[in-house]
Amino acid sequence: MGSDSDLPVMEASFEILKKFDIPFEVKVTSAHRTPEATHSFVTDADARGCAAFICAAGMAAHLAGAVSATTLKPVIGVPINGSLDGL
């Protein structure tokens, strides 16, 4: 997720993953504010055997693009409604 404010939108997906016993991690990282941390997290997750990434971010939603630039694994981008309503 791009910020803590994205958490309420993503909680439903966490419940679905739990229901199907799919292991997952939750991490707040920003493609803009913490690009090095984002890169490190994705690289480390790849090394731990992560199968896919679900990236939620509001406003410009560049997180999914930043993650997909770092991995060959599937990346699902979840747009979060921001204060500009997509403008």
Segments from the language model and where they lie:
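Short, structured active-site "lid" loops
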Residues: 41-61
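Residue-level detector of anion-binding/catalytic polar loops
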Residues: 23, 51, 74
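Short glycine/serine/threonine-rich phosphate/pyrophosphate-binding segments
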Residues: 6-11, 34-37, 57-66, 84-87
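Alpha-helix C-terminal capping segments
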Residues: 19, 46, 66-74
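N-terminal beta-loop-helix "entrance" segment that forms/cooperates
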Residues: 25-48
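Short, acidic/small-residue loops that bind anionic groups at enzyme active sites
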Residues: 70-87
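Glycine-rich phosphate/diphosphate-binding loop of Rossmann-like nucleotide-binding domains
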Residues: 1-33
